[in-house]
Design a protein with these regions (language model features):
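Cytosol-facing regions at membranes
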Residues: 1-16, 131
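Transmembrane alpha-helical segments and their cytosolic interface motifs
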Residues: 49-77
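Organelle targeting or membrane-anchoring low-complexity regions in eukaryotic organelle proteins
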Residues: 124-148
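Cytosol/matrix-facing amphipathic helices and coiled-coil assembly/linker segments
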Residues: 9-51
Length: 148
């Protein structure tokens, strides 16, 4: 079964972990909203630097693959099984949204790009970035606001 890109990680994450991530996001929004426009701008800069779970999984997989290949070349050909297993896990994650490191990374608080964007756009709305969109109602204004 192939799940949607947006939902595949949350669907394969324990409900209490999803709820914890959602609470943290909502608390962040409330905290930075009370700090005003400058606090929101600083938080948006932080969000631009936040690694989503996909990036973390890709980095871990690439690192483990390189280690497995290096050990396969220098120590024993048996180590070549490591990159093969990792490739299988990456394929499983791409199709189903689950792989062995996923629960660990989610417990550590890694969010999906959609979850990060939820916070980003809530903060932008609070800062007033989308004010002109509803007033003008044109595609040009909507695109300009989306680029903020």
């Amino acid at each position: 079964m192939v799940t949607s890109t947006r939902d595949r990680v949350p669907l394969n994450t324990d409900a209490c972990i999803n709820a914890s991530i959602r609470r943290k996001t909502e608390n962040n929004i409330a905290y930075y909203a009370s700090g005003g426009s400058d606090a929101i701008t600083r938080r948006l800069a932080e969000l631009d630097q936040e690694w989503d779970i996909e990036r973390m999984l890709e980095t871990n997989a690439a690192t483990a693959t390189l280690i497995g290949m290096t050990l396969g070349i220098t120590v024993s050909k048996k180590w070549f099984v490591v990159p093969a297993v990792i490739a299988g896990f990456l394929l499983q994650h791409a199709v189903q949204g689950w792989c062995p490191p996923l629960p660990i990374l989610r417990r550590m608080g890694f969010r999906t790009a959609s979850e990060i964007d939820y916070e980003r756009y809530a903060l932008k709305a609070l800062r007033g970035d989308f004010r002109n969109v509803s007033e003008a109602g044109t595609a040009g204004h909507a695109l300009a606001a989306a680029e903020c």
